[in-house]
Structure formats: structure tokens, C-alpha cells
Amino acid sequence: MTIIRKKHPLIKIINHSFIDLPAPSNISSWWNFGSLLGLCLIIQILTGLFLAMHYTSDTATAFSSVAHICRDVNYGWLIRYMHANGASMFFICLFLHVGRGIYYGSYNMMETWNMGIILLFAVMATAFMGYVLPWGQMSFWGATVITNLLSAIPYIGTTLVEWIWGGFSVDKATLTRFFAFHFILPFIITALVLVHLLFLHETGSNNPAGLNSDADKIPFHPYYTVKDFLGVLILLMAFMILTLFFPDALGDPDNYTPANPLNTPPHIKPEWYFLFAYAILRSIPNKLGGVLALILSILILAAMPYLHTSKQRTLTFRPITQSIYWILVADLLILTWIGGQPVEHPFIIIGQTASIAYFTIIIILMPISGMIENNILDLD
């Protein structure tokens, strides 16, 4: 068995990635989220595949086909709610994974980090297009509002929007192409994940101390396979409680009303995992400025390696930057709350303040606190 594991050209790759992989001996549970994201991706692809067998991407029948899945298909309700809530679990794991990367300075592994940002954009695009498919009120108006943002691009904007729509409004052509893209993107994401892992295994994992762990490595199996399995059990437990007891807790009631182009919902808002970016978009009165801020809210992650001023990699022994980091987390929670609120006083000013704080913390405060800590510890 050992011979096959180490010699067979295909099994050898799996062996070097998940069995004999040298891993730091001190990585905490914050390093579990990579495997949990892999599990989420598998769940989403499998449930999505079964949904696609019964779904019809036509404006006249899309809403009815989803109702048919829930009412008439064997365990269709379970597959549908697993897919919808699986997206939420995916994003919870994603945000924790990125948050871990920022806290422990994992962004210094540039290729892995940049690949992760591309993955984040790809997953967000997939989730957005998936939200359009049930063809409820929020699906239709969400698609209209978000795609319409592209019209802010100078000169080519309007043409670009009509090209994406396949007409002069969100209609049958838009739904069909969104279904096609929503189907293909997870497989592209799977390929990108493999590249992400390839880059990670070039350098090896980071660790909570932020020190070189080459002198103290342990095999991935059995230590981290067992540890990851515990994480998997906890995730599945939380996932099934959410899916079976509170299936609609994270959804929007407006999406149980079929899409009607003549009737606008009182508050157009995306799924909860986009609310922070949506709040940043809305906090800028100018359309183009809002779109740029929206893109930058994610793209700013790519600047993090260049904004790292500290001589230490992680925040483990850096109390000043630690405090600023947790203020950033609180700020993101405030933005998420504001994104779901109507555009009126006092939410407008809170959203604008939180948006300014978000960029200020990342671009100005964290680099400055890094330099202050270097001075305090005489690390210059």
C-alpha cells in the first residue's frame, strides 16, 4: 500500500497534498477553514447538480420550477434549502478564512493570497447569479440594480449593460445566461482551488507564531485529518440545524413573490453576505464612485502585503494592531447591518462613517500601528 501511495503518479499527488504533507505542529483551529470551504464547495456542486436536473431557466417557468422542486421532487425541499443555506455557510467560512489570513499575516504568501482574492471574486459572482435564478422579486430587482451599476463605466457603460442583459432589461436572455454561468463557475472555482493549494504547498502553511516552522513539522495525516474531521462535524451540525429548523432565516421574504417588473420592492437588498459591500456602495452619492468603492472594498485585500510595516508577521504579540483589527471586524458588522437598512437618517451617516473607517483602518491605522510597535520593541 505504501508503495502505491508513494509511487503511483496520481495517488502520489494526493499523498503529497493530504497525507505526507509536512505541516506546522502548532496550527490552531483557525486553519480548519480551508478544508471546510472544500466541503462547502462539494456540497454546493452536488446539491446544485440535482437542482439543475429539475430547474428551468425560463422567465415563465423558473419560479414554478423551484416551487415544483420543493413540493413534488423527492427530498427536493431539502436539496433546495441545503443549496441556499450552503451558500451562507460557504461565506461564513470564507470570511473567517480571510479574517484568519489578515490576523496571522498569511497575506505575505503573495501567490496564495492573490489566488484567494480571485477565488473570493469568483464565489461572489457565482452567488450573485445563483440568487437571480429562483426569479422572485428580490432576484429580479437585485439583478437589475447590480448589473445596472456597470452603466456607470464611462462611454461603454450603457452598451455593456445591454450586452450583459441580452436586451433592454433583465429578461429571459439574462436568466438563461446567468444559469449557464452559475452552472459552469463552480467547476472553474474548483480548478482555481487546486491552483490555490499548489501555491500554498510551495511555501507551506503559516502558523500562529508567524515563525519559520521548518524545524518542527508533523505529517498532515493523522494529526490534521482528525482535527479537520472535528471541524467538519461541527460545520455539518450547524448546517443541518440551520437547514432543517430555520431554512428561511437568512433569506428574503420578497423572494417568495414571483418577479414583477412593474412592482418595485420597498427595500432592494442582496443576500446578507453582500450587505457590507452594498453599504459601502450606497454610502457614496456618485454612481461611478460607489462602484469603484464596491470593487475596492474587496480589492484592497491585494494591497495588504504592501501595507505590512511590522517586523513581526502575525498579530499574536502586537496588542495595538490587535485592537485595531477587532475594531475593523466590528466595523464590518456595522456595515452589514447598515446594508440591510433603508436609505434614510440616521443610517446614511452611519454607513458613510463606517465606510470611511473601513478604508482608514486598512490603509492608514494598521500600517502606522505596525511602525509604532516596531519602535516600542526597538525592532527598527
UniProtKB/Swiss-Prot annotation:
Coiled coil: none annotated. A ubiquinone binds at residue 201. Heme b b566 binds at residues 97, 196. Keywords: Electron transport, Heme, Iron, Membrane, Metal-binding, Mitochondrion, Mitochondrion inner membrane, Respiratory chain, Transmembrane, Transmembrane helix, Transport, Ubiquinone. Its main location: mitochondrion. GO terms for biological process: mitochondrial electron transport, ubiquinol to cytochrome c. Pfam families: Cytochrom_B_C, Cytochrome_B. Heme b b562 binds at residues 83, 182. SUPFAM superfamilies: a domain/subunit of cytochrome bc1 complex (Ubiquinol-cytochrome c reductase) (SSF81648), Transmembrane di-heme cytochromes (SSF81342). GO terms for molecular function: metal ion binding; ubiquinol-cytochrome-c reductase activity. The keyword Iron applies. Its cofactor is heme b. One of its GO terms (cellular component) is mitochondrial inner membrane. The chain crosses the membrane at residues 33-53, 77-98, 113-133, 178-198, 226-246, 288-308, 320-340, 347-367. Binds 2 heme b groups non-covalently. It comes from the Eukaryota. Heme 1 (or BL or b562) is low-potential and absorbs at about 562 nm, and heme 2 (or BH or b566) is high-potential and absorbs at about 566 nm. The cytochrome bc1 complex contains 11 subunits: 3 respiratory subunits (MT-CYB, CYC1 and UQCRFS1), 2 core proteins (UQCRC1 and UQCRC2) and 6 low-molecular weight proteins (UQCRH/QCR6, UQCRB/QCR7, UQCRQ/QCR8, UQCR10/QCR9, UQCR11/QCR10 and a cleavage product of UQCRFS1). This cytochrome bc1 complex then forms a dimer. Component of the ubiquinol-cytochrome c reductase complex (complex III or cytochrome b-c1 complex) that is part of the mitochondrial respiratory chain. The b-c1 complex mediates electron transfer from ubiquinol to cytochrome c. Contributes to the generation of a proton gradient across the mitochondrial membrane that is then used for ATP synthesis. This is Cytochrome b. It comes from Microtus cabrerae (Cabrera's vole). The gene is MT-CYB.
